[in-house]
Amino acid sequence: MAEETIFSKIIRKEIPANIVYQDELVTAFRDISPQAKTHILIIPNKVIPTVNDVTEQDEVALGRLFSVAAKLAKEEGVAEDGYRLIVNCNKHGGQEVFHLHMHLVGGEPLGRMLAK
């Protein structure tokens, strides 16, 4: 079994977070250090450390990440103008918490993906 993370405690509501969506498969909450006007983290309730650890058994939960992202983008008013979904993987990818998570960012022009 994967190690416990700070996100595990958010899922169980053991530490405070601004949860905007939660069901049996995923939890979504506002980032504590937002990088855009809208910045929400969407995570599977099961600890999956990185994208490299995804298995076929995770497909339903990971599909739910995307359907929840679309729902939240509409609710947040960013769906029409556009937004970005970001999943970082491991150190060089910028992953800081080793519990797979998707960033939904938007609400303003986001610029280029990567600087040259």
Swiss-Prot record:
PANTHER family in alphabetical order: HISTIDINE TRIAD HIT PROTEIN
Family matches, as InterPro entries: Histidine_triad_CS (IPR019808), Histidine_triad_HIT (IPR001310), HIT-like (IPR011146), HIT-like_sf (IPR036265)
Family label: Belongs to the HINT family.
The protein's assembly and partners: Homodimer.
The protein's name in its UniProt record: Purine nucleoside phosphoramidase
Function: Hydrolyzes purine nucleotide phosphoramidates, including adenosine 5'monophosphoramidate (AMP-NH2), adenosine 5'monophosphomorpholidate (AMP-morpholidate), guanosine 5'monophosphomorpholidate (GMP-morpholidate) and tryptamine 5'guanosine monophosphate (TpGd). Hydrolyzes lysyl-AMP (AMP-N-epsilon-(N-alpha-acetyl lysine methyl ester)) generated by lysine tRNA ligase and lysyl-GMP (GMP-N-epsilon-(N-alpha-acetyl lysine methyl ester)).
EC numbers for this chain: 3.9.1.-
